[in-house]
């Protein structure tokens, strides 16, 4: 029984000298400090991983007292002694203790499973290493890895609700459809001399970590969070063969309340359905917003065959959601008050807001275009007072100085509407000319209300009356010419006779 213990002790002695050798990475900067404070705080190192040594955790005592319920804190105080024989004896005793406790499994307990943190603020969580007993040799055989994993957002852009239920969000091709990769934030070790070591960090001072050596607790801060920090942290304990023993997930939920909510209810023509859109701008994450509709205070339900929702992501601003709804016939009732109620929810946090709009209803005007007495005349009935007339000849707008528009009276069927008459001289240019009377001022397409007719001034269109007129004029001219000639001949003959006499 003595021989195995001696061999084991000699093995630990060899390991000890190996750690202290100048060629070893850990021992290169190792200094034995028996007065190490129980609280350590550090930022993960930003040194290069390639061939560079690990960084020793600086001794920075915390100014705040940390109270925990860690079991048997005072029972596991490590006493370091000098001299080779004392070190061998200490490790031999520890080895024996480990052999008696191999059936006990270590554990990691964290104070939360989800960290809800608002944009540009700091998120925190604390994890405690439960090892009984947490001896130096066991600590040196454990590695704590802190790994960030993003939550990707790929989704059906037309149905946010279904995507939210399925846990999938995003519009393929958006700048957040492909987030940052999973990466190791920090790898923490403790050697038999009680010194903690950390691996390089990919983000400098983005992450802040502190350790309570007495209670075996680790705190993590994620500073100035942005959308790319939305994901989950893995706290993994590995053995000396790099095999994972425990894997804890702490979700980092980045939050942003909606910046604004607006309802757009475009104007409609009498007889058409009302339509409205609710725009929820700059919130996070996608799927955290719930939209409901009210019509005059009553619940209105969107129809799946014609209504829906879609959203997009703007870098640095968050997600924007648009929800649409179609309501009843505008020719039956007065314009309703359409309200959009928005609830943003993350964890136990709820924020609500609403917006309202009343659409405007326009009635179809009546137009007629005719030609009379050398004018193109447009008769308009039942238009609002802000509506004006524009004439076009061959689809080219004419200056308003070339035509005249007057109010002829009030509309008898629609309140606050009036009747108009507008006319423009036709071109008597022996060609076929297109005239268009267009109403300006409606919030629809410019050519929504207009009437067009052709004025045909060609000879063929003028017909028999014109031919008769021309013939009569020519005949009269011939008769007059002949009369003049005969009169001249008579005068000539009379004058000649008088001369002979």
Curated annotation (Swiss-Prot):
One of its GO terms (cellular component) is extracellular region. It is found in: Secreted; Host cell membrane. Residues 62-72 have a biased composition (Low complexity). Residues 493-501 are cytoplasmic. Residues 258-356 form the Ig-like domain. It is a single-pass membrane protein. Residues 53-86 are annotated as: Disordered. Glycans are attached at residues 46, 91, 100, 120, 212, 354, 400, 429. Residues 1-27 form the signal peptide. InterPro entries: GA_GC, Ig-like_dom, Ig-like_dom_sf, Marek_A. Keywords: Glycoprotein, Host cell membrane, Host membrane, Host-virus interaction, Immunoglobulin domain, Membrane, Secreted, Signal, Transmembrane, Transmembrane helix. Residues 28-465 are virion surface. The chain crosses the membrane at residues 466-492. May play an immunoevasive role in the pathogenesis of Marek's disease. It is a candidate for causing the early-stage immunosuppression that occurs after MDHV infection. Belongs to the herpesviridae glycoprotein C family. This is Envelope glycoprotein C homolog. The gene is gC.
């Amino acid at each position: 029984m003595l021989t195995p213990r001696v061999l084991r002790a000699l093995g630990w002695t060899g390991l000890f000298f190996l750690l202290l050798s100048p060629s070893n990475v850990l021992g290169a900067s190792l200094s034995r400090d028996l007065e190490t404070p129980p609280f350590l705080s550090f930022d993960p190192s930003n040194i290069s991983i390639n061939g560079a040594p690990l960084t020793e955790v600086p001794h920075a005592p915390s100014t705040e007292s940390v109270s925990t319920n860690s079991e048997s804190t005072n029972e596991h105080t490590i006493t370091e002694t000098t001299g080779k024989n004392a070190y061998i004896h200490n490790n031999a005793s520890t080895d024996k203790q480990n052999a008696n406790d191999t059936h006990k499994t270590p554990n990691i307990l964290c104070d939360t499973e989800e960290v809800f943190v608002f944009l540009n603020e700091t998120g925190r969580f604390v994890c405690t290493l439960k090892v009984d007993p947490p001896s130096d040799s066991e600590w040196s055989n454990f590695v704590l890895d802190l790994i960030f994993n993003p939550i990707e957002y790929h989704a059906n852009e037309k149905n946010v609700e279904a995507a939210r239920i399925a846990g999938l969000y995003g519009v393929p091709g958006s700048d957040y459809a492909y987030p940052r990769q999973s990466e190791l934030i920090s790898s923490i070790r403790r050697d038999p001399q009680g010194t903690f070591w950390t691996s390089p960090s990919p983000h400098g001072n983005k992450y802040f970590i502190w350790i309570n050596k007495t209670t075996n607790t680790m705190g993590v801060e994620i500073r100035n969070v942005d959308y790319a920090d939305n994901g989950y942290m893995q706290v993994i304990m590995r053995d000396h063969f790099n095999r994972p023993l425990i894997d804890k997930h702490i979700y980092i939920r980045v939050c942003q309340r909606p910046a604004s909510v607006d309802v757009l209810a475009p104007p409609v023509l009498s007889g058409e359905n009302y339509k409205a859109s609710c725009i929820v701008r700059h919130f996070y994450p996608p799927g955290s917003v719930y939209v409901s509709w009210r019509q005059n205070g009553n619940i209105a339900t969107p129809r799946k065959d014609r209504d829906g929702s879609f959203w997009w992501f703007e870098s640095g601003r968050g997600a924007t959601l648009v929800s649409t709804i179609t309501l009843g016939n505008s020719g039956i009732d007065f314009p309703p008050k359409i309200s959009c109620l928005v609830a943003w929810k993350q964890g136990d946090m709820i924020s609500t807001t609403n917006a309202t709009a009343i659409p405007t209803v326009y009635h179809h005007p009546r137009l007629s275009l005719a030609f009379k007495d050398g004018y193109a005349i447009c008769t308009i009935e039942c238009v609002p007072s802000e509506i004006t007339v524009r004439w076009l000849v061959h689809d080219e707008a004419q200056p308003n100085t070339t035509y005249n528009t007057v109010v002829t009276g009030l509309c008898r069927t629609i309140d606050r509407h009036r009747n108009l008459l507008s006319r423009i001289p036709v071109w008597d240019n022996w060609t076929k000319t297109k005239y268009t009377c267009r109403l300006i001022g409606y919030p629809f397409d410019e050519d929504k209300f207009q009437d067009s007719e052709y004025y045909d001034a060609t000879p063929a269109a003028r017909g028999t009356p014109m031919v008769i007129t021309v013939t009569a004029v020519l005949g009269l001219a011939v008769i007059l010419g002949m009369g003049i000639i005969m009169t001249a001949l008579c005068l000539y003959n009379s004058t000649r006779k008088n001369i002979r006499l």
